[in-house]
Amino acid sequence: MQIYPLRLLPNKIDFDFMNFKKVSYTFSIILSLISFIWIGIYKFNFGIDFAGGIVIEVRLDQAPDLPKMRGVLGKLGIGEVVLQNFGSERDLSIRFGSSSEENLMKNIELIKGFLQSNFPYKFEYRKVDFVGPQVGRQLIEAGAMAMLFSFLAIMVYIWVRFEWYFGLGILIALVHDVILALGFMSMTKLDFNLSTIAAVLTIIGYSVNDSVVIYDRIRENLRKYHKKNITEIINLSINETLSRTILTVITTLLANLALILFGGEAIRSFSVLVFFGIIAGTYSSIFISAPILTMFVNRKFNKKVIER
């Protein structure tokens, strides 16, 4: 019994991706500029993690219906309300924004009264904290450092595995993906919170994985085809890995679509941003990180890459 791999494309596909190199560069630069301008004008919709707010810790006499509670509290008109279990399923953390410390007590009493009148649970309020914007600034700095260190680690890895200009190609693609992801967040008013920082790091990982697969095939083809120039090698390598790329993006998008549809409001920002990032990362690995090698690589420099 033979098992045949699933193929969405014929074995011998020969699409000239490199012919669209200038078009893709121009398109990416325009999108990046639009993202920068949009972010500069409209900023981000910072969530409680970064903007500050109120945290109420409460214990209930039974496990609460979180989706129903989120829906009811969303009607209060006080902005984003985040409900999460911690410890046991009866322990609940309620977080919501507060424009100032003056209306702190007003919003707390509003939440307590709303919960008491809409749910049959017994509420034991254990702690109420006010999280100021200073904490949010520290979290933003920590998130930025996490992305910076991930960029540096990826650069070192690609440099060791391939060569420095391969790392530079991936770095340019990653910066492109992050800029587009941040622009998308600003345009769609997704909550900018800790989960979206995790989403950006997920996008970085996905984009690197896609690019490394193509780079690996480029290195193999440099060994096999000594008479082809670098443009032909890159085109061949992208075409040979295209079926794998399409299958990967379809399966990951379908899995992420399930999170968007059924994951609930708590992970909505994460799942929507990752969905967009998968598309952006696939585009950049094919039309940016691979074609950009033609600016640095030619036959006389390929010996180091082939030997690794």
From Swiss-Prot:
Subcellular location: Cell inner membrane
An annotated Gene Ontology molecular function: protein-transporting ATPase activity
GO BP annotations listed: intracellular protein transmembrane transport; protein targeting; protein transport by the Sec complex
Family, similarity comment: Belongs to the SecD/SecF family. SecF subfamily.
Its biological purpose: Part of the Sec protein translocase complex. Interacts with the SecYEG preprotein conducting channel. SecDF uses the proton motive force (PMF) to complete protein translocation after the ATP-dependent function of SecA.
Gene behind this protein: secF
InterPro entries cross-referenced by the UniProt entry: SecD/SecF_arch_bac, SecD/SecF_bac, SecD/SecF_CS, SecD_SecF_C, SecD_SecF_C_bact, SecF_bac, SSD
Keyword list, A-Z: Cell inner membrane, Cell membrane, Membrane, Protein transport, Translocation, Transmembrane, Transmembrane helix, Transport
Organism field: Rickettsia conorii (strain ATCC VR-613 / Malish 7)
Its membrane topology: Multi-pass membrane protein
Gene Ontology cellular component terms for the protein in this record: plasma membrane
Protein name: Protein translocase subunit SecF
Subunit structure: Forms a complex with SecD. Part of the essential Sec protein translocation apparatus which comprises SecA, SecYEG and auxiliary proteins SecDF-YajC and YidC.
Origin superkingdom: Bacteria
Transmembrane segments: 28-48, 140-160, 164-184, 194-214, 246-266, 272-292
Cited Pfam families: Sec_GG, SecD_SecF_C
